[in-house]
């Protein structure tokens, strides 16, 4: 596998993931099929797992950050890493080659517009459901995943907090049924029944791995490619599952830019066994990108 930015280039560059640690070229390259899930404190790319994440639900609390993933991924071995820049580039390259666009959402939107949070309307005991208005319930996708929690007097509904998950964490929506002329119930496959109050909330969560396994072929989403609620796969790799994906081999260093504002230098690690959270080590041993991320006030900084 090679790529080139010129039609006349005679010596194409090998894809980085095809280069072995000793510098030789492998006859194949491997990309993880799924986002990592956690099994007994160890990350695995396996079917049927909630994506590893750092929310404070008892079932989660995984160290998913650039720094945290160094130790977390190395539990599998010194050359393991979270998603790399080359994993991401491969997906982008496949979109360019197969669909002739860099605007991936025009072809497959992924789970990018599915962030519902609704308050339960009816107190119940020993159930596996919440009751919402019919319009609210219609916004949920059967087969997708949600958490249910009693927030009490808390007003912050961020999924990070444990109280957003204290009734049921990342459980599947099994059915949606009308309960009267105005309301409908969203049922879940919680491990045990729970009580609901008027401070119980339901919130969407990322899809579990394997959500695209029933999609015929190598590309596409199960229900809709463009509804913004379904993850998709490209070249067999599942992606856009409804969560931020942290790159495990790239770090941004905050520096003073040419205009005096805080710009970002981008450093890329090309050997997972040398990953470091020490910025001096990063500057000395990582490869510095030519491009610098310019300052933008009060906004996310993207590479």
Model-derived regions: residue spans:
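Assembly/oligomerization scaffold segments
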Residues: 1-5
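Short aromatic-cysteine micro-motif
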Residues: 6-240
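Short, conserved beta-strand/loop elements in beta-sheet-dominated catalytic cores
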Residues: 79-88, 213-303
């Amino acid at each position: 596998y090679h790529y080139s930015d010129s039609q006349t280039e005679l010596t194409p560059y090998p894809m980085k993931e095809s280069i072995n640690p000793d510098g030789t070229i492998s006859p194949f390259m491997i990309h993880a099929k799924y986002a990592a899930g956690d099994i007994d404190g160890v990350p695995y790319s396996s079917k049927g797992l909630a994506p590893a994440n750092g929310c404070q639900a008892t079932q989660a609390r995984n160290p998913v950050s650039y720094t945290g993933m160094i130790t977390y991924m190395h539990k599998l071995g010194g050359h393991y890493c979270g998603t790399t820049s080359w994993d991401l580039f491969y997906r982008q390259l496949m979109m360019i080659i197969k669909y002739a666009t860099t605007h991936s959402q025009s072809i497959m939107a992924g789970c990018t517009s599915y962030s519902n949070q609704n308050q339960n309307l009816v107190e119940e005991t020993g159930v596996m459901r919440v009751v919402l208005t019919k319009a609210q319930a219609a916004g949920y996708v059967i087969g997708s995943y949600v958490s249910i929690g009693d927030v009490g007097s808390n007003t912050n509904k961020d999924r990070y907090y444990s109280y957003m998950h204290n009734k049921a964490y990342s459980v599947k929506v099994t059915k949606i049924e009308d309960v009267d002329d105005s309301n409908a119930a969203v049922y879940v496959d919680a491990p045990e029944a729970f009580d609901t109050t008027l401070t119980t909330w339901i919130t969407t969560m990322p899809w579990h791995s394997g959500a695209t396994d029933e999609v015929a072929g190598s590309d596409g989403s199960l229900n809709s490619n463009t509804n913004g609620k379904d993850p998709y796969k490209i070249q067999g790799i599942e992606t856009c599952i409804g969560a931020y994906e942290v790159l495990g081999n790239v770090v941004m260093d905050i520096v003073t830019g040419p205009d005096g504002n805080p710009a970002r230098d981008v450093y890329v690690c090309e050997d997972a066994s040398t990953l470091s959270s020490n910025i001096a080590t990063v500057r000395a041993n990582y490869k510095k990108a030519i491009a610098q991320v310019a300052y933008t006030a009060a906004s996310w900084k993207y590479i």
